Amino acid sequence: MQHLSILLVVLGSSIAFAQHDPHFADGRNTIVHLFGWKWGDIASECENWLRKKGFAGVQISPPSENPIVSGRPWWENYQPVSYDLKNRNGDEDSLSDMIKRCNNVGVRIYADLVVNHMATSIGQGTADHSYDPGSKSYPAVPYSNENFHASCDIDYNDAASIRNCELSGLKDLDQSQDYVRGKIVDYMNHLVSLGVAGFRVDAAKHMWPADLAAIFGSVNDLNTDFFPSGSRAYIYQEVIDTGSDPIDNKDYTGFGSVCEFKYGIQLATCFRGSNPLKYLENWGTGWGLLDGGNTLVFIDNHDTERSSGSYLNYKESRAYKAANAFMLAHPYDGITKIMSSYDFSDNDQSPPSDGDNILSPGFKEDGTCTNGWICQHRWSPIFNMVEFRSVVSGIELTNWWSGGDYQIAFSRGTKGTIAISINDSLDSDVPTGLPDGTYCDVISGSLSNGSCTGKSITVSGGKAHISIASDDREAAVAIHANAKL
C-alpha cells in the first residue's frame, strides 16, 4: 500500500508539472488574445499572419453558450448557460475547423474556461436553451439549485467568502461535488478532443485549489492528432494577487501556471514615468513576481484595459508599445501574452458588430486593422519583438546600461539589444554584444528586401549609437542578429 501511495504522488506530480507546458511549436513564442474574434476569422489569422510572425498560440473567447443580453456586451460571453459550443463567435463546427487549421500551421489554441459560475442575466441562450437564474436551474447541463453554493455577497477580506460567494451576483457552482466536477471535466474533455492545447481558467481565485487540482487531474490527455502521446493541457489561471489579497497565487501553482497580475502593474508605474526605469535591472522575483516557470505575463488583458487605471492599454500607445517591447526582450521566463483589442468608449461595449453579428476585421495595406479592431498583434513594434524573443531565446541578459532614471538598455548575449527612453531624449553610445555592422531597428520598422523601413543602427567596437527623441513616435529601439543588413 505504501508503494501505491508513493506511485500516486509521483504520477500526480508528473501531471501537475506537465500542465505548465504550453506545447509551443519549435521556434515560436507568445500567445495573443484575439478578444471577441469569430472562429473563422481566427482560423484565417492563424494561416495568414500568426504563423508567419512566429506567434505560438491564440487565447480565444469562451466557446460555451451564453445569454443573449440587450446591447450584446462583451461580458455576456462570461456567463455560461450551458456547455454547448455555440455563441456569437461561432458554433461547434466552425470552432473545430478553426482549431484544426491553427494546429496545422503550428499555432496552438487555448480556450477561456468559465466554470466558476453560471449566468445571472435573464434571457434566452445563444444555443436556444432556456434557464432560470432565480431558481439556479440550467437544464441544458443540467445543473439545479443543489449544485450551487448558497447565495451571498463576497467579503474580499475573507478567503472562504471569495471562494464560496457570488462574483458579481453570478451563480456560484460548488466544485467540491463529484457531479459538478464531472460536468466540468466532460466540457474540458470535449474541447480537448477538438484539439485545444490548454485553458485560461477564468475566476480561478474564486474556486478552491483542491477542487481545481482534482478537476484538472481528471481531464484527458491532449488529442494525439496534434500532440505527442501523454501530453497534458496547459493550464493558466486567473488568480488576481497584487500582494495584499487574502488569497495567495502560489496556492494554485501546483497544478498549473497563474496569470501574474503584478507584472503589468509594476511595469505601468515605470513606463508612465512614476518609477525609474533604471530600477528594472533586477526585474523578476526581486520585484515580488513569482518564479517565471509558474507564470503567464502580460501588460494588459480584456478586464484591466477597461476597469483598472493601474495598467497600461492601447490608448497610451507610446508607453504601451515600449512596455510590451521590454516584456518580449527580457529573459524573465513567464509565458508572454499580447492583448489584441477592439476600440471602445464604453466599458461594456460589444465587439464591432452590425447588431447581433460580430464584424470581421478588415486590413489596411500596411497590415493594420480596420472595422473597429485595434489588433496590437499587427503593430510592427509588437510582432517584430515576437521574432526578437525567438532569436534571443535561452540567452542571459548582459550589458545592462542606464543613462539616467528613464533611459535603459540591455543585451541578450550576442543576439539582440534593446534601448528604451521615456520622458527625456536619448543620444548616447550604449554597449551591445552584437557583431559590428548595420542593423534595422525592429521597433520603428523592419528589414525588408535588404533595406530598413525604419531606423538603421550601426554597431562599431561593441557599441551602438542610439538616438530616441522625447517626441519620437516610439520610445524604444531594438536590433537583433536576424535584422542585420
Swiss-Prot record:
Disulfide bonds join C46-C102, C152-C165, C369-C375, C440-C452. Binds 1 Ca(2+) ion per subunit. Chloride binds at R200, N301. The modification Pyrrolidone carboxylic acid is found at Q19. This is Alpha-amylase. A possible target of coffee bean insect pest control. This important digestive enzyme could be for example knocked down using the RNAi method. GO terms for biological process: starch catabolic process. Involved in the digestion of starch. The keyword Glycosyltransferase does not apply. The lineage of its organism: Eukaryota, Metazoa, Ecdysozoa, Arthropoda, Hexapoda. Its EC number is 3.2.1.1. Residues 1-18 form the signal peptide. The active site is at D202 (nucleophile), E238 (proton donor). Keywords: Calcium, Carbohydrate metabolism, Chloride, Disulfide bond, Glycoprotein, Glycosidase, Hydrolase, Metal-binding, Pyrrolidone carboxylic acid, Signal. InterPro entries: A-amylase/branching_C, A-amylase_C, Alpha_amylase, Glyco_hydro_13_cat_dom, Glyco_hydro_b, Glycoside_hydrolase_SF. Glycans are attached at N423, N449. Belongs to the glycosyl hydrolase 13 family.
